[in-house]
Regions:
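A charged, aromatic-enriched C-terminal amphipathic alpha-helix characteristic of glycosyltransferases
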Residues: 53, 351-386
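Membrane-proximal helix-turn-helix segments that form the acceptor-binding/catalytic region
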Residues: 101-104, 150-167
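Nucleotide-activated donor-binding/catalytic signature segment of Leloir-type glycosyltransferases, i.e.
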Residues: 258-279
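Aromatic "clamp/platform" in nucleotide-sugar-dependent glycosyltransferases that forms part
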Residues: 295-296
Length: 397
């Protein structure tokens, strides 16, 4: 084992633009490569964009177990592997704390995804380390967390809003909300991105017993706020010449909401379970006749943007978040009856499906590609490199 791998500080590597490159440390995700969710994908895509632009990018990665911090690289991104041997939110909190303490040994700019442990970021503020924080959605308001977790999130949100040099909102409505937490000059809206999918192998789709173009997809966490029951009820209200494919872990034996969804499903509803392999998920999206999106809360949802990037016609829950993301060319619902009538009208019209698909790609190209999103991050982060953050500016923010 190298000396660098045995110690907790990568002292043999240049930092703080010592080699002429701007430096950013990415915290708040499980790390790269992305294997979990939206924040991990954002960290990976933004990190790679910055790397191509000539930056040195250091990503903190959570690994199971105990021992010393180790270092390696993935596709040119430098990884700081932080071992944690606690499960769930306790492990995540410990991981965040370790990352903050490690990164605080340097003067490098930090890009932080999320505010779940925002109170810990006060240490970075004390050390006068510049921080740009992606504030996610209004997580504390989500009923799924319960009162105790909501209060923890609320407190951490307030701390992050106060100590961050700059805040990123991933949706205009989140941006407006953050204006109540920080000066407008301190908030920038940068949406979530996706890769465009122009072709995909049919084999993974057929291997699942599905016919390309003859099924709809619904990909989300199976919880009530994602309107799965309404979508399944609306689809199942009458026979259709399509399948409805659900991705996600459903356990009707132990979860009452899951049981309701399964009981409402017709024989044309297919439960595939939780699938994370992009070599399967991407073809499933691309060859889907339509994407159903029931999210009622949050900002720019990754699954919705990915559907637009695949050219999927979209039927989404009617709210301000989804309407901004998907645009005027898609369809919206509020009730199960709305779902049924919308599917009746759309699935029977190849012309409308084609128009919605074209509108989805048009919306994607209007500002949702990772190239566009990555460049917006670069321009913002460049303003907060340590050499450009004066004492006056740091104090003001």
């Amino acid at each position: 084992m190298s000396a660098r791998a045995r110690i907790g500080v990568d002292t043999d590597r240049p930092t703080h633009q010592a080699d002429g490159r701007p430096v950013v440390r990415i915290l708040g995700t499980h790390g790269v490569p992305a294997n979990y969710g939206g924040f991990e994908t954002a960290a990976e895509k933004v990190g790679l964009h910055l790397l191509e632009a000539g930056w040195r990018v250091i990503v903190y990665c959570q690994v199971a177990g105990s021992g010393e911090i180790t270092y390696d690289e993935w596709r040119g991104l430098e990884r700081v592997n932080v071992p944690v041997n606690l499960p769930g939110w306790r492990g995540t909190s410990l991981f965040d704390l370790k990352c903050i303490m490690h990164s605080s040994q340097f003067a490098d700019l930090c890009l932080v995804f999320g505010y779940n442990t925002g109170i810990f970021n006060t240490w970075q503020r004390f050390k006068r380390i510049p921080m740009v924080i992606n504030m996610d959605g209004i997580e504390w308001s989500r009923a799924r967390w319960g009162f105790f977790r909501q209060m923890i999130l609320y407190i951490n949100e307030r701390f992050s809003a106060a100590v961050g040099n700059h805040l990123i909102a991933d949706h205009p409505e989140i941006e407006k909300y953050l204006w109540s937490r920080a000066p407008k000059r301190k908030v920038t809206m940068i949406a979530y991105g996706a890769d465009e999918v122009l072709e995909a192998d049919e084999a993974p789709v057929r291997a699942l017993g599905l016919e390309p173009g003859r099924y709809l997809t619904l990909i989300c966490r199976p919880i009530p706020e994602n309107s799965i029951l309404e979508l399944v009820q609306g689809f199942s209200s009458r026979p259709r010449d399509f399948k409805l494919v659900l991705l996600g872990k459903y356990d009707p034996a132990t979860d009452d909401y899951h049981r309701q969804v399964v009981e409402a499903a017709s024989d044309d509803v297919v439960f595939l379970g939780a699938i994370f392999d992009p070599e399967v998920v991407q073809p499933l999206r691309f060859h889907s006749a339509m994407y159903l999106h029931g999210h009622t809360v949050g900002g720019t949802n990754p699954s919705l943007v990915e559907a637009l990037g695949a050219g999927n016609p979209v039927l989404a829950h009617d709210n301000m978040y989804n309407r901004w993301t998907a645009g005027t060319g898609q369809a919206y619902f509020t009730t199960a009856a709305d779902v049924a009538s919308a599917l009746d009208a759309i699935l029977g019209s190849p012309e409308r499906l084609a128009k919605m698909s074209a509108d989805a790609r048009k919306r994607y190209h209007a500002g949702l590609s990772w190239q566009q999103i990555g460049e917006q991050y670069r321009l913002l982060l460049d303003r907060y490199l340590p050499a450009k953050v004066t004492k006056t500016e740091t104090g003001r923010h």
